Amino acid sequence: MSGVETVLGYIDKSELGFTHSHEHIYLDLDSLIQAPKDPEKLKIYNAPFNMEIISDVKNQLSINKDNIDFVEVDTVIKELREFKSRGGGTVACLDLPGIGRNIEIIKEVAIQSQLNIIVATGWYIQKSHPEYVKHKSVDELAEIMITELKDGIEGTNIKAGVIGECACSEPVPWHPEEKKVLTAACKAQVATDSAFTIHPSLVGKELGHPPSIAETYVDLLEKEGVDKNKFYLSHSDQTCFDKDYHVRL
């Protein structure tokens, strides 16, 4: 395969142009947060995002609901048109089930922005997993991803072009359900030769764990026979000053 599936169909790699490999277009993170009980914090949580609360948001991104949901389609189209006007060609949209993936909206955004948009398959951190993920086996989850990559997503003919960002949280390096998803994603990569990305646990860094947890993910990839030339680790900027770690990876 010398190209990639986009929300509007297959394109040759020569048509990609400048590409963002990790972006979110229509994102709903309600499954990951809870409204605070403290009255003052609740006021900030429910407020429209504005300059009066920006310092609070900088200290805690999830303190304001308006800050973590990207559901204003007109704004998304406007910003992607700006990206295209400055030379952008393609965006990999890593929205997933459980965090708002909406194939029809992404398709409309692609039409209106005239960008190539690659859509994803997989699941994010455990807290966001749809209930069925808990009950399905590794092979069953792999088959869902393979179907979305080869045949189409949710009964459409729109095919995923990337696996991920399959994400990890806690306990470090992964919740058991997240490991199941990653193992299934590895099997889907081997079966389809698709690109694959993992969101590493960022909790570990905050709690003082070494950033080398990502090496655990690479060990799993090797065990499952993943083509590492098709893999990229998301959020590597979190450890950008640890040169030795990046060299090892």
Q: Where does each model-flagged region fall?
A:
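Glycine-rich anion/phosphate-binding loops
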Residues: 70-75, 95-105, 134-147
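Active-site gating/metal-coordination segments in enzymes
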Residues: 90, 108-111, 116-195, 238-240, ...
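Active-site beta-loop-alpha junctions enriched in small/polar residues
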Residues: 24-26, 96-97, 122-126, 165-168, ...
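Active-site core of metal-dependent hydrolases
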Residues: 191-249
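Active-site gating loops and adjacent loop-to-helix segments of metal-dependent hydrolytic enzymes
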Residues: 27-71, 121-139
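Divalent metal-binding segments
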Residues: 49-77, 94-99, 167-176, 201
